[in-house]
Amino acid sequence: MKEKLIELVEKEYLRSDIPQFKAGDTIGVYYKVKEGNKERVQLFEGVVIRVNGGGVAKTFTVRKVTAGIGVERIIPVNSPNIDRIEVLKVGRVRRSKLYYLRGLSAKKARIKEIVK
């Protein structure tokens, strides 16, 4: 009974407009940013290094390298601050968590792409 009630409440907050992606894919996350009374959309583009959790609590971590510095952002999938997500490249990896990319240089951190 309790699980059904939780599922019913969670169903309202699940988003259906999010595409399927996995670790190794390069994605662009268009994130809504509020600055004072203005709101704008900011692009965060990088490689998904981790997908964690499920349901409403599902999150993913995106990593990009900017000016030689690695930047990671943990983003909730069902966040209302996400405008949209685009899958730019589908990567071919054999791991579900790509933490080893943190220690690699830019050229070695490249991921093979699946060509369709």
Swiss-Prot record:
Any one GO cellular component localisation term in the record: cytosolic large ribosomal subunit
PROSITE patterns, per database record: RIBOSOMAL_L19
Keyword Chaperone listed: no
Ribosomal protein among keywords: yes
SUPFAM superfamilies the UniProt entry points to: Translation proteins SH3-like domain
GO molecular function per UniProt: structural constituent of ribosome
Record keywords, A-Z: Ribonucleoprotein, Ribosomal protein
Gene Ontology terms describing biological process: translation
UniProt-listed Gene3D superfamilies: 2.30.30.790
InterPro entries cross-referenced by the UniProt entry: Ribosomal_bL19, Ribosomal_bL19_CS, Ribosomal_bL19_sf, Translation_prot_SH3-like_sf
Lineage: superkingdom: Bacteria
Family: Belongs to the bacterial ribosomal protein bL19 family.
NCBIfam families assigned to the protein according to its UniProt record, in alphabetical order: rplS_bact (TIGR01024)
HAMAP family, sorted: Ribosomal_bL19
Protein role: This protein is located at the 30S-50S ribosomal subunit interface and may play a role in the structure and function of the aminoacyl-tRNA binding site.
Protein name in the entry: Large ribosomal subunit protein bL19
The organism of origin for this protein: Fusobacterium nucleatum subsp. nucleatum (strain ATCC 25586 / DSM 15643 / BCRC 10681 / CIP 101130 / JCM 8532 / KCTC 2640 / LMG 13131 / VPI 4355)
Gene that encodes the chain: rplS
